[in-house]
């Protein structure tokens, strides 16, 4: 895991997947900036709660300046590819949600109970399996908590 406390993270896109990732990153202390003209209800809620900074406009190259990480999560494959390429050129860790070959890291499913945190990934190959294992871990963590 990375220490994300105070890390400057860019998310381009504001759909359901982007909102889930923004929420997790913010919960781990990242300073999350979202770039997208429009987005889903969950992203609007994160903005209302002050968990993210949302710039309601299209992506520009300068949006990558000074970032630790950049996540390209739009429905435009060519834009995601451009963000990943330009981010790598700037030395930023990038995740292109639509192309695992362009990812410097995979975004895991997170199971968290108090100070215990587990991340599950199938290296971008099987999202359903990773989600299933994450849910089982969450259930197990709950049973451990209730047994104490």
Report the location of each language-model feature.
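Hydrophobic, well-ordered beta-alpha structural blocks that scaffold small-molecule cofactor pockets
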Residues: 1-46
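Structural motif
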Residues: 8, 68-69
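Short loop/edge segments at beta-strand edges and connector loops
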Residues: 36, 54-58, 98
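Adenosine-phosphate binding glycine-rich loop
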Residues: 111-148
């Amino acid at each position: 895991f990375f220490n994300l406390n105070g890390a400057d993270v860019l998310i381009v896109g504001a759909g359901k997947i982007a909102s889930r990732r923004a929420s997790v990153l913010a919960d781990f202390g990242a300073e999350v900036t979202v770039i997208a003209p429009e987005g889903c209800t969950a992203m609007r809620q994160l903005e209302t709660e002050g968990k993210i900074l949302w710039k309601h406009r299209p992506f520009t190259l300068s949006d990558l300046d000074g970032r630790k990480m950049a996540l390209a999560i739009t429905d435009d494959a060519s834009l995601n590819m451009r963000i990943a390429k330009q981010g790598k050129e700037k030395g930023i860790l990038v995740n292109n949600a639509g192309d695992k070959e362009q990812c410097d890291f995979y975004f895991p499913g997170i199971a968290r109970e108090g100070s215990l945190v587990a991340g599950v990934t199938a290296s971008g190959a099987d999202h359903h399996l990773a989600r299933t294992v994450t849910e089982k871990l969450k259930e197990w963590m709950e049973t451990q908590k209730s047994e104490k």
